[in-house]
UniProtKB/Swiss-Prot annotation:
The active site is at 12 (proton acceptor), 119 (proton donor). Keywords: Disulfide bond, Endonuclease, Glycoprotein, Hydrolase, Lyase, Nuclease, Secreted. InterPro entries: RNaseA, RNaseA-like_dom_sf, RNaseA_AS, RNaseA_domain. Belongs to the pancreatic ribonuclease family. Monomer. Interacts with and forms tight 1:1 complexes with RNH1. Dimerization of two such complexes may occur. Interaction with RNH1 inhibits this protein. The keyword Magnesium does not apply. This is Ribonuclease pancreatic. The lineage of its organism: Eukaryota, Metazoa, Chordata, Craniata, Vertebrata. It is an enzyme of class 4 (lyase). PROSITE patterns: RNASE_PANCREATIC. One of its GO terms (biological process) is defense response to Gram-positive bacterium. The gene is RNASE1. Substrate binds at residues 7, 10, 41-45, 66, 85. Its EC number is 4.6.1.18. Disulfide bonds join 26-84, 40-95, 58-110, 65-72.
């Protein structure tokens, strides 16, 4: 079974891809990373930074998570990210996403030993 840490990497890490200007980026990535199986995941963020930099966020500023849990952390610096949002007229299995590039801080939830990101909470 896929661990929470591995799931985070599959759903949110794209270190090799520089933030692309390709409008199809989200459509390709959401499908390629298995986030359109059974239903279209409505929103997803990819981070274009080295994995070590994203893992380091677990030791930065502790902030409350959206769900009220206390294991979320905000990055000290902005990161290159791509937000993927399902378009309103999109119908499964033809999931269609809007791609928007951002340079923002990220908030991730961390757990485990080693203490690593397991959930992408928000960008700020």
């Amino acid at each position: 079974k896929e661990s929470s840490a591995m799931k985070f990497q599959r759903q949110h890490m794209d270190s090799s891809g520089s933030p692309s200007t390709n409008a199809n980026y989200c459509n390709e990535m959401m499908k390629g990373r298995n986030m359109t199986q059974g239903y279209c995941k409505p929103v997803n963020t990819f981070v274009h930074e080295p994995l070590a930099d994203v893992q380091a966020v677990c030791f930065q500023k502790n902030v409350p998570c959206k769900n009220g849990q206390s294991n979320c952390y905000q990055s000290n610096s902005n990161m290159h990210i791509t937000d993927c949002r399902l378009t309103s007229n999109s119908k499964y299995p033809n999931c269609s996403y809007r791609t928007s590039r951002e340079n923002k801080g990220i908030i991730v939830a961390c757990e485990g030993n080693p203490y690593v990101p397991v959930h992408f909470d928000a960008s700020v």
